[in-house]
Amino acid sequence: SGPGFMGVR
């Protein structure tokens, strides 16, 4: 749910 790994966070 954010700018993390592929947007998975």
From Swiss-Prot:
It comes from the Eukaryota. The keyword Secreted applies. It is found in: Secreted. Keywords: Amidation, Neuropeptide, Secreted. GO terms for biological process: neuropeptide signaling pathway. The keyword Transport does not apply. Myoactive peptide. Increases the amplitude and frequency of spontaneous contractions and tonus of hindgut muscle. This is Tachykinin-related peptide 1. The lineage of its organism: Eukaryota, Metazoa, Ecdysozoa, Arthropoda, Hexapoda.
